Amino acid sequence: MRWLLSCLFLVAFASCSKVLELTKDNFHSELKSIPVALVKFYAPWCGHCKKLAPEFTSAAQIISGKTNDVKLVKVDCTTQESICSEFGVSGYPTLKIFRNGDLDGEYNGPRNANGIANYMISRAGPVSKEVSTVSDVENVLSDDKPTVFAFVKSSSDPLIKTFMALAKSMVDDAVFCHSHNNLFVTPSDNELRVYLPKRLRTKFEDDFAVYKGELESNNIKDWIRKHGQGLVGYRSPSNTFYFENSDLVVLYNNQSIDSYPSGVKYLRNRVLKTLKDNPQKFKNLVFAYSFADDFSYEISDYGIEADKLPAVVIQSKDKKYKLEKFSLDAFSDFLNKFEDGLLTPHVKSEPLPTDDSSAVKKLVALNFDEIVNNEEKDVMVVFHAGWCGHCKNLMPKYEEAASKVKNEPNLVLAAMDATANDVPSPYQVRGFPTIYFVPKGKKSSPVSYEGGRDTNDIIKYLAREATEELIGYDRSGNPKKSEL
């Protein structure tokens, strides 16, 4: 009886599953009949795939109750290698969006059931919604995203083609709507507006901005970026697009706009008042409010304790400046000092090392310039992370190489934990370990090391590239014979 119930349960589960499993024999034919499909390329042994599977299945179930135009699909790359190879799948799980069988792009949305469902359902309809009555306009304006609205004289207007292409490329960033009727105005030409998210409306600024530039996609996109969040936007992990490419002033606090809208509004209004009192002085800065929990890694990097919130940080190129315990007067003074170049940058750094006897010099943010930019020394730098397995394999060999060249007067081998210290410009660390060679006389142009990771590989590289020939090794990396 138990066996029978188990079988019935499995049959019921299989029949209820809304995830389609496709193979090389039916992949293309099936996808052509699906308006919008999210395809999961996976491997059964993959841990991340196993974690995603129940969320993916639940998302498919949610979607099936709301629309027939979106389907979730899975492909087992261990048995369907040709399909996975065709779409450049190199890791698991890989998620891609298809429209009627054509690849539409990578999936960059949430990985939980509701998030996946909402993300994909939003792609089922047209990229821009047509509005025909005045009463509909307020209804389509988004509460949490900017709404970009095109008022055009006819559906054949050239603006529509540019507008639709832009809407497709910005589907994650804004809501797009258009109308062929003169709903609010009767302009002699077309009009393009961006409306603030409803939840950001205040008495301190207009609800929308009107575009005055040329009808060129990149120009319009930059304009949306500038005006879509208003003078003080609400910055979250999903909308960082609006806060890039500019000096950014972020007010962090322990209240989210979803849980404490009145508290967020109060602090935003205080910042807005400062900006309205100084409209020209701070016009080149972008301002935002952020929920501290959404950016806990930033809070940690800046060394801000919970009892110091609300706090303000200015992110300016590769430098950061922080103000703890926000007040209106302190904030205004902080901004003025930044504009006048009177602030001291915040530097994330481990303490200076007390033991300097190791062959590999320990770098922290506070001694980096002194050691690496010493014009009398060639320096090799390893940027590592404590959790990195490749780093753990490298460091004993790197330390051995350092021991073998420790008596070289013009050479230093050093290492920095890049997760515990700010990495200065122009160094770029996108993975671990990252290694640079910094010759004397060329400190502004460090060379990325792409050589082998064994002790001898490192020594041969140093012997060959050293500004001055090493005392203990020839240019080929061979040990020099001691003179009797």
From Swiss-Prot:
Annotated compartments: Endoplasmic reticulum lumen
Site positions for Lowers pKa of C-terminal Cys of second active site: R453
Main location: endoplasmic reticulum
Taxonomy, superkingdom: Eukaryota
Thioredoxin domain boundaries: 15-125, 338-467
Entry annotation: catalytic residues: C46, C49, C388, C391
Protein name: Probable protein disulfide-isomerase ER-60
Source lineage: Eukaryota, Metazoa, Spiralia, Lophotrochozoa, Platyhelminthes
